[in-house]
Design a protein with these regions (language model features):
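Charged, gly/pro-rich active-site loop segments
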Residues: 80-148
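Iron-sulfur cluster-binding cysteine motifs and their immediate structural context
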Residues: 163-180, 191-204
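A short, Trp-centered hydrophobic/proline-enriched beta-strand micro-motif
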Residues: 8-24, 62-66
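A short mixed-secondary-structure module that forms the rim of ligand-binding clefts
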Residues: 35-72
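Extended, small-residue-rich solenoid/repeat segments and analogous flexible loops
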Residues: 145-160
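Helix-adjacent hinge/juxtasegments
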Residues: 63-88
Length: 204
């Protein structure tokens, strides 16, 4: 998969889920359908009075996820959300309304002035699929950001006993000194971490 492939898939998926954090530190999640992409930047629409807006203004860290049920593909975005500048609000609102005509029934006539547009252009994107064996996982950095890898790594304390390889459900640990986890196929289950007799495996 490429970045472009992931964007196309996110466009094709009917609705995405977006996660925020409220003022009490509790996670909140919502479905968003009214969104468009301009290259790799995603623009989405909501209404000014919603708690969703307050949450994004208080904590701009968000996560977005899309799941393709037919292909068992998941794409996750994590990054910093930004409110579109006042000069650009009308432009992107009109583009979203053109893409999603049903919005005219939700916000008819002048009531659409309550809308506000946000965007996310600097983010990490993770592609994960269960359709391959072993599973496939890819990371991308979009805009002004760096890839934040997750998972497990085998350190130099490894004694090459082979325990990790034996307990890996995807069989993606390669023999060596030290043994090596194939990161693009790692399930992140932690079974190797739990079973290493010398604690040579670290989470990052």
């Amino acid at each position: 998969m490429t970045i472009e492939d992931c964007i196309k898939k996110l466009i094709k998926i009917d609705s995405l889920q977006i996660a925020t954090v409220d003022k009490n530190g509790s996670p909140q999640i919502r479905v968003i359908s009214a969104r468009i992409f301009n290259n790799t930047t995603m623009y989405f629409l909501t209404a000014k009075g919603k708690s969703f807006v307050k949450e994004m203004e208080n904590n701009r860290n968000i996560a977005i996820i899309g799941f393709d049920e037919k292909e068992n593909d998941m794409i996750r975005i994590t990054g910093i959300v930004e409110k579109v500048s006042q000069e650009e609000q009308l432009k992107w609102r009109n583009k979203i309304y053109e893409t999603y005509p049903y919005l005219e029934n939700v916000y008819p006539n002048e009531t659409k002035n309550i809308n506000v547009i946000y965007k996310i252009e600097n983010y990490n994107m993770e592609y994960f699929t269960l359709s391959t064996h072993p599973i496939t996982r890819q990371y991308f950095a979009i805009g002004n950001t760096k890839i934040k890898f997750k998972g497990f790594k085998i350190g130099n304390e490894c004694i090459s006993c082979g325990t990790c390889k034996t307990v890996c459900p995807q069989n993606v640990i390669t023999e060596g000194t030290p043994f090596v986890i194939q990161q693009e196929h790692c399930l992140h289950c932690g079974n190797c971490f739990d079973n290493c007799p010398v604690n040579a495996i670290k989470e990052f």
